[in-house]
């Protein structure tokens, strides 16, 4: 009888030890996952353009980074920058920034970014086609003004708007402020960039069209699979 009690106590103690080890394993895995999901800032850490390069479109406006804020001056048509660094987002991930139009009448945030892989990119447009269209270009060869991601929103000059994107291999989501504007399944869809100068912004770039804008707080982090 005593031996049975001892054996039972041993099993109970072993169960506690195993349970504790499992808990520690879970804690380590959780910490590793949290470390993988840390925000990565894409703004230069010191004065200058950092890992960003001004693009030559012909007639483009000046671009400058200052204290974490990118200013893109109005050009004849397209103006912008491309990222040349190593911290390129890889799906699944989320990316966020704030943007505002200070002058002009067209898009103040043209964010080109990788989706399924670095060679497959789309552009998130905020304030395009006369100042109000929001959406992704291109899906199945159709621009944001033509596909189901497009919607019209009213934007005020000099007002900051928070933009958050969630990029997965088979879906795209977008929020402006607290409002979700895009939630589209892209499985089996053809994703790509509009033909023309916007291709220079790949795989990660920021641009405007005949508009002066300021953009800040640009960062990304991994999402769980």
Briefly describe each language-model feature range.
Residues 162-190:
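Carbohydrate-binding surfaces in secreted/extracellular proteins
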Residues 61-80:
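Short carbohydrate-recognition loop motifs
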Residues 77-137:
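Secretory/extracellular carbohydrate-interaction modules
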Residues 97, 218-220:
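Extracellular beta-strand elements of beta-rich domains used
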Residues 184-214:
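Flexible glycan-contacting loops in extracellular carbohydrate-active proteins
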Residues 25-56:
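Extracellular carbohydrate-recognition regions
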Residues 81-87, 149-155, 204-205:
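Beta-strand-rich interaction surfaces with strong enrichment in secreted/lumenal proteins
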Residues 140-162:
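Short, aromatic/His-centered strand-loop micro-motif at the edge of beta-sheets
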């Amino acid at each position: 009888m005593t031996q049975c009690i001892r054996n039972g106590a041993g099993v109970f103690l072993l169960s506690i030890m195993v349970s504790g080890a499992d808990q520690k394993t879970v804690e380590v895995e959780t910490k590793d996952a949290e470390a993988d999901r840390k925000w990565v800032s894409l703004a230069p850490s010191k004065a200058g353009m950092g890992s960003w390069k001004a693009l030559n479109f012909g007639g483009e406006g000046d671009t400058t980074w200052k204290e974490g804020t990118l200013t893109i001056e109005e050009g004849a048509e397209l103006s912008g920058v491309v990222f040349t660094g190593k911290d390129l987002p890889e799906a699944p991930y989320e990316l966020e920034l704030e943007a505002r139009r200070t002058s002009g009448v067209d898009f103040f945030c043209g964010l080109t970014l990788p989706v399924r892989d670095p060679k497959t990119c789309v552009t998130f447009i905020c304030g395009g086609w006369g100042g109000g269209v929001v959406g992704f270009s291109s899906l199945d060869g159709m621009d944001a003004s033509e596909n189901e991601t497009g919607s019209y929103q009213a934007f005020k000059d000099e007002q900051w708007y928070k933009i958050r994107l969630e990029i997965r291999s088979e879906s795209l989501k977008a929020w402006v402020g607290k409002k979700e504007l895009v939630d589209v399944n892209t499985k089996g869809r053809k994703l790509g960039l509009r033909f023309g100068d916007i291709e220079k912004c790949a795989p990660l770039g920021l641009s405007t069209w005949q508009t002066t804008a300021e953009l800040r707080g640009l960062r990304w982090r991994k999402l769980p699979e």
